[in-house]
UniProtKB/Swiss-Prot annotation:
The keyword Cytoplasm does not apply. It comes from the Eukaryota. It is an enzyme of class 4 (lyase). Residues 28-44 have a biased composition (Basic and acidic residues). Its cofactor is pyridoxal 5'-phosphate. One of its GO terms (molecular function) is pyridoxal phosphate binding. It comes from Homo sapiens. The gene is PDXDC2P. Belongs to the group II decarboxylase family. GO terms for biological process: carboxylic acid metabolic process. Gene3D superfamilies: 3.90.1150.170, Type I PLP-dependent aspartate aminotransferase-like (Major domain) (3.40.640.10). This is Putative pyridoxal-dependent decarboxylase domain-containing protein 2. The keyword Calcium does not apply. Residues 12-40 form a coiled coil.
Amino acid sequence: MDASLEKIADPTLAEMGKNLKEAVKMLEDSQRRTEEENGKKLISRDIPGPLQGSGQDMVSILQLVQNLMHGDEDEEPQSPRIQNIGEQGHVAVLGHSLGAYILTLDEEKLRKLTTRILSDTTLWLCRIFRYENGCAYFHEEEREGLAKICRLAIHSQYEDFVVDGFSGLYNKKPVIYLSAAARPGLGQYLCNQLGLPFPCLCRVPCNTMFGSQHQMDVAFLEKLIKDDIERGRLPLLLVANAGTAAVGHTDKIGRLKELCEQYGIWLHVEGVNLATLALGYVSSSVLAAAKCDSMTMTPGPWLGLPAVPAVTLYKHDPALTLVAGLISNKPTDKLRALPLWLSLQYLGLDGFVERIKHACQLSQWLQESLKKVNYIKILVEDELSSPVVVFRFFQELPGSDPVFKAVPVPNMTPSAVGRERHSCDALNLWLGEQLKQLVPASGLTVMDLEAEGTCLRFSPLMTAAGMIS
């Protein structure tokens, strides 16, 4: 009995007090147990299953990842679940883990190591792709490099942009020129990133009379530039293609370079054909890209390397590159080059060149094979060096234009020609699906071109990971 209850003379009252205290304690204990149980149920209900308890072992976690990667085991796989990335791919993947470990170094060692990695990779890429005295910006989003280059061009043309901001552009609006054959959404992306209105974009049409219909019309571009200057606008930057997104054609970069120098316009080049700059033989149109102001490349797909960043090479301007965001002192930004730094050393120059050469040879072999097949039309710009092959089945109509498209003839009504075109497109769509199932590693794609209709594209440089064997 508690000492406080012992002081009560009346034993009956003391007993009642004791019983009351015990009863209250029982009620409190019961309430506490109920609250604890409800709390556990609440936690169990709110916390996802994998996080409950004291954690899981690594084997179980990796098993879960494997199941997620493979999907439902009962499904019949339509294509290989996991791409074989090869040993050089494992080196690139290692770069990401190694980068996380490097970040644990002390500040001075980290600075020296990241600077060395960035400078080495920049030098190697400039030498391989014949780009003299250039700097490199590594980025995950392929279009990000061009957005940074646009900022650099704005700062170089508008000296007071740092102080005045966008109000400094009002009196002389900048103009960015894009080819009609540019990849979809590029113009909108640039305007969103730069905060520019859509009228700052100028779409340059492709040739209609002479040359490739997927190649920028240089004469029309010059007319657009003159018109913009007369209206008080500032021609800022031109994006040229060394391999258009659709058919892999290259603009007349040499002529465009002369035009840009004449009017003080920044020339940026992008496209899959830039990979051929690493080869011994390079077409003159692509070789001219080595003299441009900047160019964006994607060595990851070209070499079959996973998780390797895109690279934009540009002419260095110490006063402006920092403010344009092309240079960063953050170790994490410099370490973006690490996977490529490791992979280039693993492959060596011979291995690097051999992969690009092999992809180009695959295109040449396909071209030679298609020439032997009746009713196959090939849309290739340069049969000797083009790494992209676009083709389609097409049975020419009597009196039709043999240059890859059907045109009305006197004996056929427009509706008959339309039905013929529709049937041909449907057949090419079926042909593409069949070829993709027969040779899934080919990376063959089916696309619709405005003038030609449904076509099949073979671009081994963009599917190099599947072409290793």
